[in-house]
Amino acid sequence: GDTPSHMVMPAIHYSKEDVADLFESYTKQPEEPVITKEVKTSRRVMRPKFLSAEMGVSGANVAVAETGTVITMTNEGNGRMVATLPKTHLYIFGIEKFVAKMSDIRYIFKVLPRNGTAQNITAYLSFYTGATKVVTDPENDTKEDKNFHMIILDTPERRKIMASEDYKDIFCCIRCAACLNVCPAFRLVGGHVYGGSIYTGGIGTLLTSLARSQTYIGRWGTCSGSCSMATASWRAALAAPRADSPLLV
């Protein structure tokens, strides 16, 4: 499969013609390169899968240590269907997603939609705190407790980053992609060239290299122009890691 080219809009490199070809290869039916029709095709194919799924898997934009609440911000209804329709709901996120108190989330709510999609708030703002009820028999309105689980990625690599005076601010990144949108190198070559296997752009190269694999760290030196535009857009943008950094040894 393909890899994301942008943090907020991972498939932005696909044209409507590309999407039509992709849908045709999957559905084996003709597809016009018209966005409204492609949306209907996507809904027709995906809706039965949502309704029949036994488990939904979500990622968190924010997690609140005070209450155990996980929060997802999205403009797509499928995010809420994944969380509410299946009997089992699994959240997977890193420890860097935690804030201490519920009152702290307002800062992320203010910045993330504005920087990511130029909105005051996303269309869907979902809070999940523990297990809820799920309808298991619609005809009789029978409900059972949902299975709710969280996998929190607390890895040695993440701990090293958090303990580092040089690079701990990298976890201030909320994946809004503001730095990508102003980056001359990213706009020229795209996220498949400038970025890691998971996250894109300069900040994505750092995140992937420090938290998972150093394979992509060379792309920073190749693409970074040290123009400071990313730093101006968001304080989490950092200078290139030194070759002798203990995190890269």
Question: Residue spans of the language-model regions?
Answer:
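Ferredoxin-type iron-sulfur electron-transfer modules in oxidoreductases and energy-metabolism complexes
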Residues: 138-170, 180-181, 186-249
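The feature marks the mature, well-folded catalytic cores of soluble enzymes
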Residues: 1-165
